[in-house]
Structures are given as C-alpha cells and as structure tokens.
C-alpha cells in the first residue's frame, strides 16, 4: 500500500494540520446548519441560496502566539507611559476574573454571516446521501435545454453554412454593384468577332472595333473585381438553447404519522421527499407538491403540519391512498399531469388493510402514476433481521405483489441517509423503452 508524505512547509505562524482541522470543523458547522434548515424548512426551498451564520469564534484559523499569562519578559517596550526599567509587573491571574464587575465594558463579536450558492447548498445536502458524482452534476442542472434554429449568423462553423441564404445575398450584391453577367460578355465578344471578319478599310469600322474591345476589357476587369461569392455574403445557420417545452408534474408525499414514527423516521422521510423533488425539478418546469398524512384517517395538509403536527393515532394506510385518488380526480387529471408518488411508513398497519392497499394500487393508482415509490423506514438493528425482501410486515408483503406486476413501482427499506439513493437508480438510469402505464 503506498504511503504519501506531505513535505509542504507550514505557512508563517500556522500549521497545516491545524488548518485542515479548522476547515473540517467549519464544514461540519455548515453541514449542521444546512441539516437544520432542511429539517425545519420547506422541501422546495432546499434548491435555493441559503443565508448561513457561523459563530465569530469559529471563523479564525488557529495561529501560534505568545501566552500573556506565562513566561518572563525582561524588557520594556518603548513608548509606554506607565512603566520604567526595573519595575515589577504582577502577572494576570489564570482565572476569568470577577463575574459582573466588567459587565458592559467588553466588546462582543457578531456572528459571521454569508450566502451559500445553490450548488454549495446541494453539495452539503448530498454529502450524507452518497450519490455518485454524475448524479450530483445532473441534479444541479436547473434547466434542460435543447438546440433550436434561431435565424442566421455571419460567423460559424463551415458545417452550418446555409447555401440558400448565402446565394441570395450574393445575387443581391452582384445586382447592386452591377457585376457584368456572362451573357453580356459573351454577346460583346460575338459582336467583336463579327466585326473582325469584315473588311477593315473604313475608319468608323476600326473605331467601333476598338471601342468594343475597350468595353470588353472594362467588363472583364469589373467582373474579376466583383467576385461571384464574397465572404460578406456567407450566412450560417444559428442555433440557440431553448428550454424544453413546459411540462407539469405533481408529487404526492404520503406519510404515516402514527406514534411509531419518531423524529428520526420523519427526518429520513423528508430527505427522501427532498431528493425526489430535486429529480423531478430537473425534468419538469412546474411541480406541485401535495402532502397527505394519515393515522386511522387521512387528509391533505400543508408542509408544516405534515412534518411537525403532534397528532397521532392508529394506522390505516388505505385512507391515504383513497385521499390521493380523490385529489387526482379533482385537480390532477392523468392526461394533463405527470403524477409521482412517494410513500413513507414504518410498515405498521391495521389487520386486513394491507390487502386493501394493494388492491387500490393495482386497480386504480398505478395506471395513473408515472412512478410510485414506497419507503419503509426501519431501525439499523433491524437490517439484519429483514435480510431478504420477502420478509417483513404485512404491508411490505402486500406491496411485493404490486412490485412484481408494475415496472413503475419501486420499494425499498431505509435505515440511514445513505440508503435513500438506490431507490432512484432504476427510475432515472438509462433503461430500455417500456410502457409505464398499463
């Protein structure tokens, strides 16, 4: 195994090791701040610039300096008015001094504030998700463009020359500059040839012949000076990037909010919803987000209520699917909207309702959705228990029947942030053409 030795010299009064630790500490502080913003903010706001504050004590890089509380100094700096050579100056104590004696006399430092760009925010957000680099680059692309014709240009690649427009410009220029035509020169040459065959005795005959020759010479020189195609005539096809045609998508977020879904489970679910939103934002210009939460009853709520309401109760998952179907029929017809759904749950469900959920997906929802993702959030200790995909709760087993029949259905278990990305590989990777809607 190769060993790398860093032989770089330390900068003045600083240590490279300290600098690296400082940068790591600052990055961890930024990650913590972004994580809190994602946790407390809206899903759609993740893909935007963020104002970030850091404590002022954390933005200074460590440096070596003398300790004023230790060591001996046997000299007096020039220019002071208090001390002279030979005076004994008591050292300051190592304690912090009296508690309130100096209140109001010290100077405090404000927090250091700066703006993180959209790309920097996404870098920090993606760090825990372990996304491949190419996927990160694709997600950062805010708009997808295609090339379209946009008139003509006087410069460009030879492969883009527009012959028709070039010849049109050439023809107009030759008319404007009165370039002699080939027919005109040939007619003049025929007339000269005819006169040359006649007897040359008369003076008028010789004068006429000389005039015609001079005229022919002028026309030929003018024709050579005015080229048939000049560089100013050339036109190239011009292309400009154009956003893809407007397309609309709706993203349904379904989540179980019963007592078994704690803060860790909700945080993982929110990361999953954020990542799906970023994928869809790259494909579609307009995205609506519908939040449906359920216990033993389901309802459409706003984002704040979806994640932070304290309501809890029993668990009947089919109520969320019925509510989603109602919203689709009322506001999002499948022939006008691309429908995506993401469901997060811990797998708990009332007895007998899991079969009802599978029936709703089979008969109603999967024919309307472009993609449906089910995420079951488990504890890391349960990963070994559910080693195979066949083992699991009744809801998991019921959804396995849907997964086997619909290629646009994807299900997975998540125990930590790094488990979130694989659920997107199948949907957004290159795959053969297939009909998603049956």
Curated annotation (Swiss-Prot):
Compositionally biased spans, kind Gly residues: 93-105
InterPro entries listed in its UniProt record: UPF0229
Pfam families from the UniProt entry: DUF444
Region Disordered, annotated ranges: 55-107
Family: Belongs to the UPF0229 family.
Protein name: UPF0229 protein R01398
Organism: Rhizobium meliloti (strain 1021)
